[in-house]
């Protein structure tokens, strides 16, 4: 199993591969399975011709990487950005495979992207880019193949354009071709807040651990210094503020 030079800054894919190599060694993964899982199942590169509002024809590069379909259709977002790269998309697609597997969701991992600056594009230009990108990857996506979703600089509107374009080619409405679409088109309520809500759950659990640890520290401090717990809490807080202030002075 290959090793990665840790002296240089790793790309997104190299970082994923380095972590995968560590996990593979710990699991004693079969060499053949290791090779199969380390590389994506399919990489699609498209060149998207779009007529801009000025009448000028421009061409944008787009990608869709399907890392694994071993556990079901691949699943992953589509991102727009000037710094999008195939390497990044490749690494993020693999991470989607691991995320779905670790919580036992029957999907594989995928990711897509278009190199463009959405902040410099009009709504009409974004729509034309999205629809043409969808048409270019049409044969590789679908409810039973690969299901896109919003990601960086894409949203419900982007998914609505993808769904509409796919449905026009299918000659019937296909709601399940994307997730993250508007509720009016069959999207899930609460999807927009889902990531933030998940973060809230994690923070709540972590805060509970911190509060228990802090309470135990107060009790120990009170017992060791022969003071009541309220005084101990104040004294610990003062010590902590003094320590943080000193650290800022040292490292500022």
PLM regions and their residue ranges:
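Adenosine-phosphate binding glycine-rich loop
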Residues: 3-11, 208-252
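Flexible, glycine/charged-enriched surface loops at secondary-structure junctions
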Residues: 30-36, 104, 141-150, 172-176, ...
